[in-house]
Amino acid sequence: MSHTSEQGASRPVALMMGALGVVYGDIGTSPLYTLRACLTEFADLQPAHILGVLSILFWLLMVVVSFKYVLLILRADNQGEGGTLALLELAVRGRSGRLRTFFVVLGIFGAALFYGDSMITPAISVLSAIEGIGVVSHTLDPWIVPLALLVLLALFAIQSRGTGTVGKLFGPVMVVWFATLGVLGGWQVWQTPEVLVALNPIWALRFVFEFPVMSFLLLGAVVLALTGAEALYADMGHFGRPAIRRAWFSMVLPSLTLCYLGQGALLLRDPSAIRNPFFLMAPEWGLAALVGLATVATVVASQAVISGAFSVTRQAVQLGFWPRMQILHTSAVEKGQIYLPQVNALLLCAVLVLVITFRNSENLAAAYGFAVTGTMLMTSILAFAVLPRGSTGAKRLGWMLVLGVLLIIDVLLFSANIFKIHEGGWMPLLVGVVVFTLMMTWRRGRQLLADIQARDRQPLQEFMDQLESYPPARVPGTAVFMTLNNDNVPPALLHNLKHNKVLHDHVLFLSIRVADVPYIAEQDRFSVKRVSASSWQAVIHYGFKEDPDVPEALRLVAEAYPEIDLEPMRTSFFLSRQAVVAARRPAMSRWRRTVFSFMARNSTRSTKFFKIPPNRVVEMGMQIEL
């Protein structure tokens, strides 16, 4: 076999290993706390309770994760990319009016709730793992919170170095983790095979009919088994649909099923093991090693949501829902490996506060469920708008029925968690509302600024024709004017002519456009149009998962259009620096205008975001009434 064919054969395995390490870290560590959170509600734990809850848990895994996410939602890809914002772009494509606004609001709120998830996952995962030392010895209980804080501090501290090197270990670590789950659970099931009856959905239905109110409230805890389901969809672009599906059905689902059944088997024999059924499955001689492995696995799970928060923020910036932020690439090879210092610092502070405030994983469980079910519900509604598109007749009706049933399940899960708002669910709700408000305020403010500039616009073609007829003094070199709308005269050009009364020999009007697809092919990167004898328009296109690099794009333009003269040392960039002031009849309320102004002042400067050399930039200040 040739080297190339060997590489081709090994690639699916490598992708599957990567999916195990990144995609399934969150859902793979759920057994640490899920069953305990479900069954602690029962004062007198009976076999019927254990088997009923196990049956509900198993069939939710099958319906929500296996069927909804792995088989259906993964079909809704935006050129291979997944995630809430990618799904939002598909949902609004070709739509307008109130329906478009409705989907935008849903998608943005779903993305906002993800930040709550990104804060809770590291806290609850690491806490639940280190709580295992309390099983080893109760004298170690006071060390649980300090050790969790140390692990989390170390995790966030290494983010700036990138996850490339550590990431190579994630796959093998999670293979060992899932194998351990299967072995521990399988051994317990072997000792108490009666637990296997929980795989029969009759037990779930019987439990629901016997304890209807308890069953509904219990959904708020059972949903913890589904945490990380969104990661399957969000990380589709990294590993592809086939690898994610193979990893789920070949290893993750069997291991999780055995682990949950194993905990149930242990509880059937010894209901007092409810204090920590996961760690009590292990023999005493292996407890310390299991605590260490669990801690590493929860670090992997935490890394997945931290990286996810970085990716979601970059997409929000590119799509115009968030101000520009510093984005650092931590790998010269993998363009998806990025680091956002401000996001990392905010997440770290939030996670540390959560650990210090809630102090154990059981207290955090209520907060976790609300964030998870909220995001899942938003995804289902958007999928309802995307997946049936293009279908007709019976096929479309089939899609609507299936998605309708799944939507009802998500509504039930979300509704059950509403009752836990006072227990901790308020935290992700508060985070979601704050982030949603900030994102919508930024989008609204930018739209108002664009409308004001459009209202005061001067047609570019007409203006440049006048300059050619009545030319001002010319200076050597090329001036690049950054503009939102290439059809209108940039304010920076007007200010330059007003104050400096000169124009460069060559003028390029440059716009950046972000498409609703993740990546743009190099041959479609830019378009150029001549405006006058000495001026041109250029539009540079990027996908919402790409980082703008203006000098590199202009290098490509210069190769194709040498007459523009874009030699770096003879090129100056003219940018507008806008300051927002109150208008007599403001278009925004005072508090929103204050928030928008604060976000604008603290956004990353255009020079850094677009990678423009600072020594080649001239900024023209201007005030805009809002």
UniProtKB/Swiss-Prot annotation:
<feature type="transmembrane region" description="Helical">
    <location>
        <begin position="169"/>
        <end position="189"/>
    </location>
</feature>
<dbReference type="InterPro" id="IPR053952">
    <property type="entry name" value="K_trans_C"/>
</dbReference>
<protein>
    <recommendedName>
        <fullName>Probable potassium transport system protein Kup</fullName>
    </recommendedName>
</protein>
<keyword id="KW-0472">Membrane</keyword>
<dbReference type="GO" id="GO:0015079">
    <property type="term" value="F:potassium ion transmembrane transporter activity"/>
</dbReference>
<dbReference type="InterPro" id="IPR003855">
    <property type="entry name" value="K+_transporter"/>
</dbReference>
<feature type="transmembrane region" description="Helical">
    <location>
        <begin position="138"/>
        <end position="158"/>
    </location>
</feature>
<keyword id="KW-0633">Potassium transport</keyword>
<dbReference type="InterPro" id="IPR023051">
    <property type="entry name" value="Kup"/>
</dbReference>
<dbReference type="GO" id="GO:0015293">
    <property type="term" value="F:symporter activity"/>
</dbReference>
<keyword id="KW-0997">Cell inner membrane</keyword>
<feature type="transmembrane region" description="Helical">
    <location>
        <begin position="13"/>
        <end position="33"/>
    </location>
</feature>
<comment type="function">
    <text>Transport of potassium into the cell. Likely operates as a K(+):H(+) symporter.</text>
</comment>
<keyword id="KW-1003">Cell membrane</keyword>
<feature type="transmembrane region" description="Helical">
    <location>
        <begin position="338"/>
        <end position="358"/>
    </location>
</feature>
<feature type="transmembrane region" description="Helical">
    <location>
        <begin position="277"/>
        <end position="297"/>
    </location>
</feature>
<feature type="transmembrane region" description="Helical">
    <location>
        <begin position="421"/>
        <end position="441"/>
    </location>
</feature>
<dbReference type="Pfam" id="PF22776">
    <property type="entry name" value="K_trans_C"/>
</dbReference>
<dbReference type="InterPro" id="IPR053951">
    <property type="entry name" value="K_trans_N"/>
</dbReference>
<dbReference type="GO" id="GO:0005886">
    <property type="term" value="C:plasma membrane"/>
</dbReference>
<keyword id="KW-1133">Transmembrane helix</keyword>
<keyword id="KW-0406">Ion transport</keyword>
<comment type="similarity">
    <text>Belongs to the HAK/KUP transporter (TC 2.A.72) family.</text>
</comment>
<keyword id="KW-0812">Transmembrane</keyword>
<feature type="transmembrane region" description="Helical">
    <location>
        <begin position="207"/>
        <end position="227"/>
    </location>
</feature>
<feature type="transmembrane region" description="Helical">
    <location>
        <begin position="367"/>
        <end position="387"/>
    </location>
</feature>
<feature type="transmembrane region" description="Helical">
    <location>
        <begin position="102"/>
        <end position="122"/>
    </location>
</feature>
<dbReference type="Pfam" id="PF02705">
    <property type="entry name" value="K_trans"/>
</dbReference>
<feature type="transmembrane region" description="Helical">
    <location>
        <begin position="53"/>
        <end position="73"/>
    </location>
</feature>
<keyword id="KW-0630">Potassium</keyword>
<feature type="transmembrane region" description="Helical">
    <location>
        <begin position="248"/>
        <end position="268"/>
    </location>
</feature>
<feature type="transmembrane region" description="Helical">
    <location>
        <begin position="399"/>
        <end position="419"/>
    </location>
</feature>
<keyword id="KW-0769">Symport</keyword>
<keyword id="KW-0813">Transport</keyword>
